[in-house]
């Protein structure tokens, strides 16, 4: 027997018992973002490696340790996209959508990072991203956060997530703060965890969100980022808070929140939950005014966020918030006995679908006696089973069995669709 080929570790199949939940989540997101005027954009899974080195940052964990990178046959370095923002910027700028324009865009699809697989964290994972371009003021930051809050409300998650906010200021303000932070932490370098020691010379802001207890204890007396924030950045942050308060969006300010990608500035935010253990963040984003220019485009203000589909599905399942309507179910199972009845069953099944496009009609295929077909009808968990035989064809009727009650009655073939639609 040939050896079975398995899926790659950390890259999971989405099987039919879960795909209906994914479709429900994706449709809910699509409906919400459309109501705010966002249009979908799609871009390749594979990009030039330099896009992520320049966009995400060469000293980030993603670029240093987590990217799937390879050379093609022409020797060009390519990478499976580890996140969507840089690709969205590249695609929109290449198409001429950004300069002197405002754009509201969203996307969804798989991303790839070489990480240790664990619950809620995978090597192939799926994100939904929402990005706004051409608007530099805090009102668009607020719009995105309010949009995400509306999504949580639609999904029943609003009371189960918390919004955390921070401002990390302008690049010049961050540089001044980094210098002060490095100066302070250098005295304690040997006491920092291994990752923080490495980040001290590459990406010191990331030390702020270290999970190591000893490092956090050292940080208690470290310089505060808020002391380095200038008037412009603070005014931006104050307006954002005012808009959120006016719209009844609760939040907490987390001064240690810095985000892990180099392109962020001013506003950063995360939606976190206590229901998923260590994988607490379900949505994160912020402002990235310098990224378009950094990737070769004209200076363009921008802000956006991304959310992980796997984590959201896990959260919905953990909280038992998946509505019955989101689960796949069969409404009608059609069985037939005899050649004439088989032909008639095709016609009837199509008529049912024509009269109600939301109806799920499963028609038995593959032959078999009546008993075997009824067993399959039972296993389908359909609400109704339609039985067609030669006697029914001759009389212009079908037998309709309500599988929830066991009651079976004859119905006119012409009228059975109306009856079923009224009952469902």
Curated annotation (Swiss-Prot):
Query: Per its record, how is this protein called by name?
Result: Histidine--tRNA ligase
GO BP terms, alphabetized: histidyl-tRNA aminoacylation
User: So what EC number does this one have?
Assistant: 6.1.1.21
Compartments reported by the entry: Cytoplasm
Alphabetically ordered keywords of this record: Aminoacyl-tRNA synthetase, ATP-binding, Cytoplasm, Ligase, Nucleotide-binding, Protein biosynthesis
Q: Top EC class per UniProt?
A: ligase
Tell me the domain of life: Bacteria
> Which reaction is the catalytic activity of this chain?
tRNA(His) + L-histidine + ATP = L-histidyl-tRNA(His) + AMP + diphosphate + H(+)
Predominant cellular place of this UniProt entry's protein: cytoplasm
Q: Name one GO cellular component term.
A: cytoplasm
Q: Tell me its family.
A: Belongs to the class-II aminoacyl-tRNA synthetase family.
Q: Which GO terms describe its molecular function?
A: ATP binding; histidine-tRNA ligase activity
PROSITE patterns, from UniProt?
A: AA_TRNA_LIGASE_II
Taxonomic classification: Bacteria, Pseudomonadati, Pseudomonadota, Gammaproteobacteria, Oceanospirillales
